[in-house]
Curated annotation (Swiss-Prot):
Name of the protein described by the UniProt record: Glutamyl-tRNA(Gln) amidotransferase subunit A
Subunit structure: Heterotrimer of A, B and C subunits.
Reaction catalyzed: L-glutamyl-tRNA(Gln) + L-glutamine + ATP + H2O = L-glutaminyl-tRNA(Gln) + L-glutamate + ADP + phosphate + H(+)
One GO CC term, this protein: glutamyl-tRNA(Gln) amidotransferase complex
Organism placement in taxonomy: Bacteria, Bacillati, Actinomycetota, Actinomycetes, Mycobacteriales
Originating organism: Corynebacterium diphtheriae (strain ATCC 700971 / NCTC 13129 / Biotype gravis)
Domain of life, source organism: Bacteria
Summary of the function given for this chain in its UniProt record: Allows the formation of correctly charged Gln-tRNA(Gln) through the transamidation of misacylated Glu-tRNA(Gln) in organisms which lack glutaminyl-tRNA synthetase. The reaction takes place in the presence of glutamine and ATP through an activated gamma-phospho-Glu-tRNA(Gln).
Assigned keywords, A-Z: ATP-binding, Ligase, Nucleotide-binding, Protein biosynthesis
InterPro entries for this protein: Amidase, Amidase_CS, Amidase_dom, AS_sf, GatA
HAMAP family in UniProt: GatA
Gene Ontology BP terms: translation
UniProt key word Protein biosynthesis: yes
Length: 494
């Protein structure tokens, strides 16, 4: 038995929906559930390092408030009231540091809560703490954290993925039943695949980015993670919705994701057309990953789905376009971290000019990958290169969105492997940025188009006995399709 994976029994072994039912029926208290997860964190996180900050008193106080309300006979604040959660350390919180895993923000406590944080609190969900990540969400392994890497509970010599590896590791180890992450090019879906959990990137604009420390504003999207499709849907409904404080927030009804998950749990996919993306089913991927993907497609067929092959030719250019657009936005967004207003300040001894203080602060505060992307973005946006690089990448982005539109004329959802390989060893790709970037091949086209996607467990790869993920992709604002197909697939896996 792997002691770092979810225990076989006890409160930390249960799904969020099961825990909510027990709490709301008063079979157990929210304090008991929250304490059980805090104890689990205490037991295993010294090794896994999924959390950067654990708020014991704050979590228990929130749990006590839920218990007090339920004991008075009041209705639960939400379907998940009382069930604790792990929050990626990129959402600002007034009662805990928000570091984005960077020395630049070490010890920084925000004066306000992110909208997602606020919605979680209003739903009666205790926040266990803030989880580890790649610095400013830049990376695919959680090795770029200034505070050390997170280890994969399935094999502690391997990465849990990134940038949100801390949240996924917390779920996979039973440290938390629910999690919130962000997805810029796969940072929710990719760690979910490597840790055998469920992660969803909602349609861009449907979950508020107010209070989310920006990496690349046109790509970033907060989203839910959990160990089951239903749990993920329940959390999705909590955090989604229009927000007047976010200029990119879309004012439209939230997709009926919970109803879709319950419908999909019947396991019947008759009448559903599922597209297999030709560009994501090819040689070069780990054989065990492709084998599990082909088994997944066979299972979907057995459940009644009609499978069609779709061609998305511009997906081959997605990686290059993404790694031009993202650094350009990073270069702009991270200009605010200058050592003058908040965060790390170096050289503030009266002997340095303001410009020198800024330079010293940024040199000391940012890690190598963040510096690399700032330099790339600044170069691509400079005079003489803007048209040749940035505008060209934006044109490719438009073509990728058109590829998706053509594909969805033929099918309801698309499927692919979530990652080209299973979890890789710690340190294996750190010195080779291109190899690390290639790990996002399957996930980043979705972000460029602003659509929605899910990764869910698709079995262990025969050649490595490590988790693989099936990625499901749906059109904008059709997030419920993810949950219907995902829940059906999940049932078929059992």
């Amino acid at each position: 038995m792997n002691k770092y994976l979810v225990p076989d029994s006890g409160l930390t072994s249960l799904s969020a929906a099961e825990l909510a039912e027990k709490i709301h029926s008063r079979e157990v208290t929210s304090r008991e559930v929250t304490q059980a997860h805090l104890d689990r964190i205490n037991d295993v996180d010294g090794t896994l390092h999924a959390f950067l900050h654990v708020g014991v008193e704050e979590a228990l106080a929130a749990a006590d408030a839920v218990d007090e309300s339920l004991d008075k006979g009041e209705a639960p604040a939400s379907a998940l009231a009382g069930v604790p959660l792990a929050l990626k350390d990129v959402f600002v919180t007034t009662d805990a540091p928000t570091t984005c895993a960077s020395k630049m923000l070490e010890g920084y406590v925000a004066p306000y809560d992110a909208t997602v944080t606020k919605k979680i609190r209003e739903a009666g969900i205790p926040i266990l703490g803030k989880t580890n990540m790649d610095e400013f969400a830049m990376g695919s392994s959680t090795e770029n954290s200034a505070y050390g890497p997170t280890l994969n509970p399935w094999d502690i010599e391997r990465t849990p993925g990134g940038s949100g590896g801390g949240t996924s590791a917390a779920l996979a180890s039973g440290e938390a039943p629910l999690g919130i992450g962000t997805d810029t090019g796969g940072s929710i879906r990719q760690p979910a695949a490597l840790t055998n959990t469920v992660g969803v990137k909602p349609t861009y604009g449907t979950v508020s980015r107010y209070g989310l420390v920006a990496c690349a504003s046109s790509l970033d999207q907060g989203g839910p993670t959990a160990r089951t499709v239903l749990d993920t849907a329940l959390l999705h409904e909590v955090i989604a919705g229009h927000d007047k404080y976010d200029a990119t927030s879309v004012n439209r009804a939230v997709a009926p994701v919970v109803a879709a998950a319950r419908e999909g749990a019947r396991g019947d996919l008759k009448g559903t057309k599922i597209g297999v993306v030709k560009q994501f089913d090819r040689e070069g991927y780990q054989p065990g990953v492709l084998e599990q993907f082909h088994k997944s497609v066979e299972q979907l067929t057995a459940q009644g789905a009609e499978i069609v092959e779709v061609d998305c030719p511009h997906f081959d250019d997605a990686l290059a376009a993404y790694y031009l657009i993202l650094p350009c936005e990073v270069s702009s967004n991270l200009a605010r971290f200058d050592g003058m207003r908040y965060g790390l300040r170096e050289g503030d001894d009266g002997t340095h000019s303001a410009e020198e203080v800024m330079s010293l602060s940024r040199a000391a505060g940012f890690g190598p990958e963040v510096k690399r992307r700032i330099i790339l973005g600044t170069y691509a946006l400079s005079v003489g290169y803007y048209d040749a690089y940035y505008l060209q990448a934006q044109r490719v982005r438009t073509l990728i969105a058109q590829d998706f539109a053509v594909a969805y004329d033929k099918c309801d959802v698309l499927v692919s492997p979530t990652t080209p390989t299973t979890a890789f060893k710690l340190g294996e790709k750190v010195s080779d940025p291109l190899a690390m970037y290639n790990f996002d091949l399957c996930t980043l086209p979705l972000n460029l188009a602003g659509l929605c996607g899910m990764s869910l467990p698709s079995g262990l790869a025969p050649d490595s006995q490590l988790p693989t993920g099936l990625q499901i992709m749906a059109p904008a604002f059709q997030d419920d399709r993810l949950y219907k197909v995902g829940a059906a697939f999940e049932v078929g896996q059992k």
